[in-house]
UniProtKB/Swiss-Prot annotation:
The keyword Signal applies. This is Amyloid-beta precursor protein. Residues 18-701 are extracellular. Residues 756-770 are annotated as: Required for the interaction with KIF5B and for anterograde transport in axons. InterPro entries: Amyloid_Cu-bd_sf, Amyloid_glyco, Amyloid_glyco_Abeta, Amyloid_glyco_Abeta_sf, Amyloid_glyco_Cu-bd, Amyloid_glyco_E2_domain, Amyloid_glyco_extra, Amyloid_glyco_heparin-bd. Zn(2+) 1 binds at E183, C186, C187. The transmembrane helix undergoes a conformation change and unravels partially when bound to PSEN1, facilitating cleavage by PSEN1. The basolateral sorting signal (BaSS) is required for sorting of membrane proteins to the basolateral surface of epithelial cells. PANTHER family: ALZHEIMER'S DISEASE BETA-AMYLOID RELATED, AMYLOID-BETA PRECURSOR PROTEIN. The record marks M706 as: Susceptible to oxidation. Keywords: Amyloid, Apoptosis, Cell adhesion, Cell membrane, Cell projection, Coated pit, Copper, Cytoplasm, Cytoplasmic vesicle, Disulfide bond, Endocytosis, Endoplasmic reticulum, Endosome, Glycoprotein, Golgi apparatus, Heparin-binding, Iron, Isopeptide bond, Membrane, Metal-binding, Notch signaling pathway, Nucleus, Phosphoprotein, Protease inhibitor, Proteoglycan, Secreted, Serine protease inhibitor, Signal, Sulfation, Transmembrane, Transmembrane helix, Ubl conjugation, Zinc. Heparin binds at residues 96-110. Residues 391-423, 491-522 are annotated as: Heparin-binding. Residues 723-770 are cytoplasmic.
Length: 770
């Protein structure tokens, strides 16, 4: 009986996977679907061969709105009549995701929940009802909710009946990915387990939770997938850093990746993966262990928004993933996280309630146990070159301590509720309120400790970056002061200095992006400070670069290399600003006359060494000679001599060194608040732009607008007065002399006649006479 039922279930599941709504499109091998993974090109199902293909245009990535998803379905399936979209019930494994602008695609898979593109008129899914299972449905015509809402309704309904949700489908569409009901099948817990066990015994390649037809996790192959994914992600990071370090002889990059945490995370991930078997109990055990892990950022420095399952809250919560390492409690979306962890963890809690002596399924791992003074230990230890690794370990210890305390409180809460079953309602409410306050207190305490940890880490990183920049600047000036100066050495020192400034800017932007995602209000408050700091970095770089003018021979020899370095730095700044500052355009007045910034590039200009900075001094970097500085020919701006005022007008000659230059002249750029406020520094369309305000043209435009406004206002006032006067003017058809001695009735009749009134009696007799 059971093997036959297992085969029937397997056949039904296979038929369901290949089911396509009928709209005159017979013969399709697969259902139209699309899948998205942020940072990669979208994928869509090839309905002819059943394989996933990358975006045909090579440009489309994450889509935020359901309307956009529907439109994208219609674009990739133009021959089908796509009318709606709905999330799939289960996540799938997809390989060969492509990055935008790259020809070769990575082979490691990602787990995502695809969207089904519905063809033609909506037809509800045909659900298979196994033996001892019940088919149920709910419809509410006054409700129009998403797939996730109805999935939750179905799951809760089955849980109330002490059963497990076996399958479900949407009913009565009312919008894009919105429906008015759900149909579902509830099976007894033991029956569901037997069914899945039988199906797994027949089909070794099937996997309840990580199910993807393209991936085989039997015999430890899951380890290979995880390791390949992590190795390729680490390879990408190393490749990018290798590009940054190209031609850098002294290796000036800030190395913040710690191998020790990565190895530990890899070992922990591998140990979890190797326990996977083809039985449902083993799969659920692995899922419970995965979903009970604490969120780990990993040793890398990216800030990728991900989700993890929080066992204390019983729901998924966001966190930032570094890009490599970490563990498998790491999901792309909240829906995917709940789909994997929600059902198994709720079943575990139900079993725990029914069997008090059973092992606690959500018991936290004790590998990261910490002492109460874990944060204090980090705060008391001075920073060093391994600051990032120390910070990661301190953060993990803090999270472990917090989870231990929360787990203890939740166990106490559960025990208190069990003991309070026979108490009055008021006492039960008091118990609940007490533990809620305790949980909130622990959360607030943990948040404060996290904030203190992050602020300390930020301060140490800033101090380290400042030291590196100061050292690079001193080496650069020393190279310029050498007699005779060596052009190649000067260029290498200049490159190290530019990289140090670039690191400072990258750190500032990443911190701002983190604050903006966590606390948008605080991000709005510190935005002006961030922009001021970025402007200081640009001006400091410009001032340092201008020192090359004092050694014309060196400047001429390394001109091409410097141009290439600045172009690379400019492209990097454009990319970083476009990715990190994704906010609407902020206007500060005269930007309406500026050109479109889609074609505007941020240039690194040269500024005078002495004297005040002015907006007219900001010119693009061009080729220069030994005796003069070229002008910006496009805008016809006069050349700026970047040499000291005392040397302007004198003929420079090769070999004139900088023996009298002091480090203090350019080590720091001091800016008061008034100078910062009056600068022409703005952010437009995610790019950093310096521009010179044309004061004369702006005044003329303002005067013209004022005169035009006065004229228009005058015309409006005159028109209103005339209309009002006309409204209250009496209608006269002629002048009729009225005797003052007549009665009021006659006077009233006279006025009526003046306004066109005709006595019907008079009119009747006039007609009779005629």
């Amino acid at each position: 009986m059971l093997p036959g039922l297992a085969l029937l279930l397997l056949a039904a599941w296979t038929a369901r996977a290949l089911e396509v709504p009928t709209d005159g499109n017979a013969g399709l091998l697969a259902e139209p679907q699309i899948a998205m993974f942020c940072g990669r090109l979208n994928m869509h199902m090839n309905v002819q061969n059943g394989k996933w293909d990358s975006d045909p245009s090579g440009t489309k990535t994450c889509i935020d709105t359901k309307e956009g998803i529907l439109q994208y379905c219609q674009e990739v399936y133009p021959e089908l009549q796509i009318t709606n979209v709905v999330e799939a019930n289960q996540p799938v494994t997809i390989q060969n995701w492509c990055k935008r602008g790259r020809k070769q695609c990575k082979t490691h898979p990602h787990f995502v929940i695809p969207y089904r593109c519905l063809v033609g008129e909506f037809v509800s899914d045909a659900l298979l009802v196994p033996d001892k299972c019940k088919f149920l449905h709910q419809e509410r015509m006054d409700v129009c909710e998403t797939h996730l809402h109805w999935h939750t309704v179905a799951k809760e309904t089955c849980s109330e009946k002490s059963t497990n949700l076996h399958d479900y489908g949407m009913l009565l569409p009312c919008g894009i990915d919105k429906f008015r009901g759900v149909e579902f099948v509830c099976c007894p817990l033991a029956e569901e387990s037997d069914n899945v066990d039988s199906a797994d015994a027949e089909e070794d390649d099937s996997d309840v939770w990580w199910g993807g037809a393209d991936t085989d996790y039997a015999d430890g192959s899951e380890d290979k997938v995880v390791e390949v994914a992590e190795e390729e992600e680490v390879a990408e990071v190393e490749e990018e850093e290798a590009d940054d370090d190209e031609d850098d002889e002294d290796g000036d990059e800030v190395e913040e990746e710690a191998e020790e945490p990565y190895e530990e995370a890899t070992e922990r991930t591998t140990s979890i993966a190797t326990t996977t078997t083809t039985t449902t109990e083993s799969v659920e055990e692995v899922v419970r262990e995965v979903c009970s892990e604490q969120a780990e950022t990993g040793p890398c420095r990216a800030m990728i928004s991900r989700w993890y399952f929080d066992v204390t809250e019983g729901k998924c919560a966001p966190f930032f993933y570094g890009g490599c390492g970490g563990n498998r409690n790491n999901f792309d979306t909240e829906e995917y996280c709940m789909a994997v962890c929600g059902s198994v963890m709720s079943q575990s809690l139900l079993k725990t309630t029914q069997e008090p002596l059973a092992r606690d399924p959500v018991k936290l791992p004790t590998t990261a146990a910490s002492t109460p003074d874990a944060v204090d230990k980090y705060l008391e230890t001075p920073g060093d070159e391994n600051e990032h690794a120390h910070f990661q370990k301190a953060k993990e210890r803090l999270e472990a301590k917090h989870r231990e305390r929360m787990s203890q409180v939740m166990r106490e809460w559960e025990e208190a509720e069990r003991q309070a079953k026979n108490l009055p309602k008021a006492d039960k409410k008091a118990v609940i309120q007490h533990f809620q306050e305790k949980v909130e207190s622990l959360e607030q305490e943990a948040a404060n400790e996290r904030q203190q940890l992050v602020e300390t880490h930020m301060a140490r990183v800033e101090a380290m970056l400042n030291d590196r920049r100061r050292l690079a600047l001193e080496n650069y000036i020393t190279a310029l002061q050498a007699v005779p100066p060596r052009p190649r050495h000067v260029f290498n020192m200049l490159k190290k200095y530019v990289r140090a400034e670039q690191k400072d800017r990258q750190h500032t932007l990443k911190h701002f992006e983190h604050v903006r995602m966590v606390d948008p209000k605080k991000a709005a408050q510190i935005r002006s400070q961030v922009m001021t700091h970025l402007r200081v970095i640009y001006e400091r770089m410009n001032q340092s670069l201008s020192l090359l003018y004092n050694v014309p021979a060196v400047a001429e020899e390394i001109q091409d290399e410097v141009d290439e370095l600045l172009q690379k730095e400019q492209n990097y700044s454009d990319d970083v600003l476009a990715n990190m500052i994704s906010e609407p355009r902020i206007s500060y007045g005269n930007d309406a006359l500026m050109p479109s910034l889609t074609e505007t590039k941020t240039t690194v200009e040269l500024l005078p060494v002495n004297g005040e900075f002015s907006l007219d001094d900001l010119q693009p970097w061009h080729s220069f000679g030994a005796d003069s500085v070229p002008a910006n020919t496009e805008n016809e701006v006069e050349p700026v001599d970047a040499r000291p005022a005392a040397d302007r007008g004198l003929t420079t000659r090769p070999g004139s060194g900088l023996t009298n230059i002091k480090t203090e002249e350019i080590s720091e750029v001091k800016m008061d608040a008034e100078f910062r406020h009056d600068s022409g520094y703005e952010v437009h369309h995610q790019k950093l732009v310096f521009f010179a305000e044309d004061v004369g043209s702006n005044k003329g435009a303002i005067i013209g607008l004022m005169v035009g406004g006065v004229v228009i206002a005058t015309v409006i006032v005159i028109t209103l007065v005339m209309l009002k006067k006309k409204q209250y003017t009496s209608i006269h058809h002629g002048v009729v002399e009225v005797d003052a001695a007549v009665t009021p009735e006659e006077r009233h009749l006279s006025k009526m006649q003046q306004n066109g009134y005709e006595n019907p009696t008079y009119k009747f007799f006039e007609q009779m006479q005629n």
